[in-house]
Amino acid sequence: MTATPRMARYLEYSTQIYNIYLKYIAPEDIHVYSIDEVFLDVTQYLKTYGMTARELASRIATEILEKKGLTATAGIGTNLYLCKIAMDIVAKHMEPDDNGVRIAELDEISYRELLWDHRPLTDFWRVGGGYRKKLEAAGLYTMGDIARCSLGGEQDFYNEDFLYKM
């Protein structure tokens, strides 16, 4: 099956969804990553709305569904990396709620618990096939392996310098 690309329509939807974000978040707290992905820094809005990050994400996703007929996936984290990983690896692989929405949360502890042994490394943001091959050639197959490698001292084979030189 093939589909004709309709970029103008895609851009129109993207703009309309961005306008939904603006109902909740100021433009300086919306960081566009791509045409269909943004980072929202909602930290200062949670108290104002009296909501958790999950509740606010759910409200925004529900409005996107109601106004545009599109389901949304959200990743919530204590930093941008964890937000992205929560969305890319955890949320996209979980069962949706009744509205088709998927929301996953990660902090440093849950990242270790859920993803320390996750494979393949290419599922992680910014780890491409070439870098994966270099890491695996060095015996590093998981994020846990990489984290342990960074703990090595100057005299150890595995240490931070080893990673930087890859």
Task: Locate the predicted segments by residue.
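Gly/Gly-Pro- and Ser/Thr-rich, intrinsically disordered tail segments characteristic of DNA damage-repair
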Residues: M1-M166
